[in-house]
Design a protein with these regions (language model features):
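Beta-strand-rich assembly/attachment modules of structural machines
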Residues: 1-118, 127-128
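Acidic, small/polar-enriched beta strand-loop surface segments
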Residues: 2, 198-293, 299-301, 305-345, ...
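Short, surface-exposed beta-strand/loop "edge" segments at domain boundaries and coil↔beta transitions
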Residues: 11-14, 43-46, 61-65, 95-99, ...
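Oligomerization/assembly interface segments of phage tail-like spikes and tubes
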Residues: 24-42, 83-96, 234, 293-307, ...
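Residues that flank catalytic or metal-binding motifs in active/ligand-binding sites
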Residues: 32, 67, 86, 174, ...
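Well-ordered beta-strand positions in beta-sheet-rich domains
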Residues: 65-70, 87, 206, 245, ...
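Solvent-exposed coil/turn segments that connect beta secondary-structure elements
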Residues: 74-76, 91-95, 194, 237-239, ...
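Charged- and aromatic-enriched interaction segments used to assemble
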Residues: 84-85, 91-225
């Protein structure tokens, strides 16, 4: 595989056709990252500078560049066996958004997609403070996702949040993927959702990883209740006997697992809202905190990347696929990460599955 060097939005300027190893990690919810190790000669040192962009062979066509990485660190090392080696590491274009925070308080109400687009517009594309604008940054077409912000999203406000971190959190909550790519000399922000390729639908051909198909090398099934809670007390504003307190959960006996929930972040907005409304907000917040402690059930596994199904042909990052292990335990799980690696021993392409609770 060849790797190409880009000069920002100006396109490809050079090619890397020889290296010791590369790891290219592309993520559905999080920020992509990479590591490239190659000869530490003058040519490589001079051309692989911090801020340069890298793109893989096969990830670009007709002015569109995907899975682009930004060089953020360089390390030059020497050993008797290896000689001088240059290691460059960095992250994907998504990490551009880690350079911005939510500057002004933003209320989270309504549909998820318009809220995300508004946050990007207000803090990246058309901010009030002109110095905060990122030039040549645009948004892809709206996808029309119907997801509504849950009333349990803390106090439904953002202020000072790192945008890349917030994007990972909110997209994971609603199973939405996000990306930043280059098209026609513009940085393009997009939201997307993977296809359903499980047994639970009839539109797409199911993609099944199972020992029966010789495409599941190993698997691990986990069912864990160590962090599980299903009842609790939520303490809100006020002190002592004047503190607002509600209880959540109705389990009883040995089936009841309690926790204390600090609801001080849930605001009554200076008593602008009624007491009844505030207690409802506290209850919703408590329910969301309980939800975060639910039973963990997941299947992990290593698949044969070039077996019966091939990534980027039969299934893609973000898709829901079916896993059936040796004990006929079946799970619908999302491809949340694809790690490509290459060295002198060859190349591998390993998908990573989500926990069941994530989807």
């Amino acid at each position: 595989m060849n790797i190409y060097i880009m000069d920002g939005l100006n396109g490809i300027t050079d090619i890397i056709d020889s290296f010791r190893s590369v790891i290219w990690n592309v993520q559905y919810y999080g920020v992509n990252d990479f590591e490239l190790i190659l000869a530490g000669n003058a040519k490589n040192i001079n051309r692989l500078t911090v801020g340069k962009l890298l793109v893989r062979e096969g990830d670009f066509s007709a002015g569109k560049y995907e899975n682009v990485m930004i060089i953020e660190t360089r390390e030059l090392s020497f050993s008797v066996d290896e000689g001088w080696l240059l290691t460059v590491r960095g992250s994907g274009l998504k990490n551009i958004l880690s350079r911005r925070i939510v500057w002004n308080q933003t209320n989270l109400t309504g549909k998820v997609e318009p809220i995300i687009r508004q946050v990007i517009t207000d803090n990246v594309i058309d901010p009030v403070v002109p110095e905060r604008k990122i030039d040549n940054f645009i948004m892809d077409a709206e996808q029309g996702f119907s997801d509504e912000i849950q009333s349990t999203e803390s106090d439904n406000q953002l202020s000072g949040d790192n945008i890349a971190e917030w994007m990972e959190s909110i997209c994971k909550t609603y199973s939405i993927g996000w990306d930043v790519y280059i098209n026609n000399s513009k940085y393009v922000f997009k939201l997307y959702r993977g296809e359903d390729r499980t047994f639970n639908q009839s539109i797409n051909v199911p993609v099944v990883f199972s020992p029966e198909y010789d495409n599941l090398i190993n698997s691990k099934y986990t069912y864990d209740i160590t962090e599980f809670k299903n009842a609790g007390v939520v303490a809100g504003e006020g002190e002592g006997s004047a503190q607002a307190v509600v209880s959540v959960g109705n389990a009883s006996g040995l089936d009841r697992f309690e926790m204390y929930i600090d609801g001080s972040s849930v605001s009554s907005n200076g008593e602008i809202i009624t007491q009844q409304t505030y207690l409802k907000l506290l209850t919703d917040f408590g329910d969301s905190e309980l939800k975060a402690t639910q039973t963990l059930e997941k299947v992990e596994g290593e698949v044969v990347a070039n077996g019966l199904y091939k990534i980027n042909r039969d299934y893609y990052l973000g898709d829901l696929v079916q896993i059936v292990n040796e004990y006929n335990i079946s799970a619908e799980t999302r491809i949340v990460e694809v790690i490509y690696s290459e060295d002198e021993n060859g190349s591998t392409l390993v998908p990573t599955f989500s926990d069941w609770s994530d989807d």
